[in-house]
């Protein structure tokens, strides 16, 4: 028996609300899923962003003053010259992860002053 999607869609269009409700319940029971789960996940994600207290500082681009950006990255991260240069050359890259909002803003200001483009995530 071949599955004909057009026929299934046509049947769904003709079904009443009660029949569609029964169909959803049957699918939930048969496959062990719920129709409400994606909506709850989206709502939880939005609430999490509103109360976000830690950020990742991402170097999006080094800009024209690459040497100054490398120096700033070394100062902020404590990395050696080679590692800091590799991080700057590999942009976009995370400079620091899971930092407080105030510290993230300070890091962003230092790096932007050095000529970098920064994104807080």
Swiss-Prot record:
Pfam families for the chain: Ribosomal_L12, Ribosomal_L12_N
GO MF annotation: an example: structural constituent of ribosome
Nucleotidyltransferase is among the record's keywords: no
Keyword set includes Metal-binding: no
Keywords tagged on the record: Ribonucleoprotein, Ribosomal protein
Gene3D superfamilies for this protein: 3.30.1390.10, Single helix bin
Name of the featured protein: Large ribosomal subunit protein bL12
Species for this entry: Streptococcus uberis (strain ATCC BAA-854 / 0140J)
Gene name linked to the record: rplL
